[in-house]
Amino acid sequence: MEYPIAVNYKYTSNLYTARKWLEELPDVIACDFETASKFTRKEKDLMKFRLDNRRLSFEEHRVLLQQYESNGLSHPSLTVITHLSIGWSDRDALVIICDNNSMRQFIFDFLVTTKRHQIWHNSPFDFKHIRFNTGLLPISYEDTMLKSKSLLNDANPYRDKVSLKELMAYAYGDWAISKDEFTLEEMWKESTSKYSGTDACATFKLYQDLQEETTKWRI
């Protein structure tokens, strides 16, 4: 196999197309979310003006500052998912761009009702969005971060590796993008969709690697 692996991905924001793609998926899929603050740059500019120029109560200031400083890593009440990527091999992925609440709800409903086995890396991050929006979790899943932490790593916690980018750099190189691209304004950029698709394929490849290792050890 040649490295780095070139990922083949396709993307859509069309609900009909997304539904058709999801119906055709195999039984084991790797999934990943991209997220962003739910507030636009324009909305944040207005928040900044209010914070700098208005007399606010302590509670008003606290809430407004929390909204102003929010990013894709913030609480689900302050964020939205912008992409769902799904990989079913080490190089094939689809990316669904979630640019409205109808698409987001469709995605959440799919993830908590499908019987396909879902592979996630660092599932607590993604699952907090699923749980917050549905009150449920996927039916069948496993977490490659937890599995890596349990099976592959050094007993010394200061020497172990669980980051997907670290674990899979040998196969995909450095595919990270700037944190500034995780915004509502940047969600349509080709680089963001490529990043999202690579995340899903890297997760699937890590899942395959772990399966091979555990088979060797007869685990």
Locate each region found by the language model:
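Conserved RNase H-like, two-metal-ion catalytic cores of nucleic-acid enzymes
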Residues: 1-166, 170
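Mixed-charge, glycine-rich, non-catalytic linkers/tails in nucleic-acid processing enzymes
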Residues: 135-144, 177, 182-219
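Non-catalytic alpha-helical coupling and interface elements of nucleotide-dependent molecular machines
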Residues: 152, 169-173, 208-212
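Short N-terminal secondary-structure initiator segments
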Residues: 157, 162, 170-186
